[in-house]
Swiss-Prot record:
Gene Ontology MF: a single term: sialate 4-O-acetylesterase activity
Similarity annotation: Belongs to the influenza type C/coronaviruses hemagglutinin-esterase family.
PTM description: N-glycosylated in the host RER.
Topological category with respect to the lipid bilayer: Single-pass type I membrane protein
Region (Receptor binding): 128-266
Protein name: Hemagglutinin-esterase
Length: 424
């Protein structure tokens, strides 16, 4: 055991010379069972629509284009497809899920339902939406979109109540009052059905203030009732504001079943699209790469707010996004982050990805996978190391055996050489 302190000292010296195995700022995977959701920065098919035709607009290495592990669409995002007519059917499956999208719905787009609305509320909606997506994709393998069929027995049609620029809200649908309704005080219902998935993410939205019509103010009131279980989900507007009047959305995770959408005032809303969650898996944190513009455009931090441990690891560049194709496409820092998809890594943590599973100078926080056993270098000036004792002891024994073998061999050759000299 006299070798053990020496071995620890040698280990510390090695660590002080640079063998730290530090966490790296990349997204990666432990094996080939992974999937990436993205936008133009990982959309390999977008090359046919751009000039010049080259892959420098992507942050993704083109080697991965034929992997079959990417669902990306230029100009879109999962949130944008979920709520608006500008739709792309994001679909993918994997044990390890990576997200690099969200920039196509930011304060730069300035969406709000009406002139007196508030884009801040839509940024809040975005954060709440991605929180549900990230949490659930840590326990589900498969994500896709499904249409939600509904039946409304009245004659009124759905109306595009919320639109701004090229964005038109169609989820949830808004059904206007019947022609014979004297005002907005009325009860109305519609049936909708969820089937074919393990669970669904659906929107439940209400206006956050008072709606003025014909000198009267109305409060929003929306409910979903599960007719199979008797569970009711509902919201009533309680705010008195009349400016900044916009749509607050909550994102429910619901099982399959028959539902009733109910409104007691203002307008009836009913979901038309849902995130379909399928195939339960062992808990595996998702990885999210910050999705933002160059500083010349306004971005938000909602994906960072939504991505919290233990269900999510967030990766970001420390510098401004500056692309080589154009200012918003082909940034070196984000290309470096996505380069981790080219190889397997044994360990993931809040701090980053560890390339090796032996020792490290950093304790992995919220670890996943086969992670290093080293704990910490407690003093930056004096390399005082704390290691998991088992591998240290085993390595010490191996080192001791090696030293004994070397000593025996040296003695053997010394004795053999002495014998030869004596014989001479």
């Amino acid at each position: 055991m006299f070798l053990l302190p020496r071995f620890i000292l040698v280990s510390c010296i090695i660590g002080s010379l640079g063998f730290y195995n530090p966490p790296t700022n990349v997204v990666s995977h432990v094996n080939g069972d992974w999937f990436l959701f993205g936008d133009s920065r990982s959309d390999c098919n977008h090359i046919v629509n751009i000039n010049p035709h080259n892959y420098s607009y992507m942050d993704l290495n083109p080697v991965l284009c034929d992997s079959g592990k990417i669902s990306s669409k230029a100009g879109n995002s999962i949130f944008r497809s979920f709520h608006f007519t500008d739709f792309y059917n994001y679909t993918g499956e994997g044990q390890q899920i990576i997200f690099y999208e969200g920039v196509n719905f930011t304060p730069y787009h300035a969406f709000k339902c009406n002139r007196s609305g508030s884009n801040d509320i839509w940024m809040q909606n975005k954060g709440l939406f991605y929180t549900q997506v990230y949490k659930n994709m840590a326990v589900y393998r498969s994500l896709t979109f499904v249409n939600v069929p509904y039946v409304y027995n009245g004659s009124a049609q759905s109306t595009a109540l919320c639109k701004s620029g090229s964005l038109v809200l169609n989820n949830p649908a808004y059904i206007a009052p019947q022609a014979n309704s004297g005002d907005y005080y009325y009860k109305v219902e519609a049936d909708f059905y969820l089937s074919g998935c393990d669970e669904y993410i659906v929107p439940l939205c209400i206006f956050n203030g008072k709606f003025l019509s014909n000198t009267k103010y109305y409060d929003d009131s929306q409910y979903y009732f599960n007719k199979d279980t008797g569970v009711i989900y509902g919201l009533n507007s309680t705010e008195t504001i009349t400016t900044g009047f916009d749509l607050n959305c909550y994102y429910l995770v619901l099982p399959s079943g028959n539902y009733l959408a109910i409104s007691n005032e203002l307008l009836l809303t009913v979901p038309t699209k849902a995130i379909c969650l399928n195939k339960r898996k062992d808990f595996t944190p998702v990885q999210v790469v910050d999705s933002r513009w160059n500083n010349a455009r306004q971005s938000d931090n909602m994906t960072a707010v939504a991505c919290q441990p233990p269900y999510c690891y967030f990766r970001n560049s420390t510098t401004n996004y500056v692309g080589v194709y154009d200012i918003n496409h082909g940034d070196a820092g984000f290309t470096s982050i996505l380069s981790g998809l080219l190889y397997n890594s044994p360990c993931f943590s809040q701090q980053g990805v560890f390339r090796y599973d032996n020792v490290s100078s950093v304790w992995p926080l919220y670890p996943y996978g086969r992670c290093p056993t080293a704990a910490d270098i407690n003093n930056p000036d004096l390399p005082i190391c704390v290691y998991d004792p088992l591998p240290v002891i085993l390595l010490g024994i191996l080192l001791g055996v090696a030293v004994i073998i070397i000593v025996v061999l040296l003695l053997y050759f010394m004795v053999d050489n002495g014998t030869r000299l004596h014989d001479a």
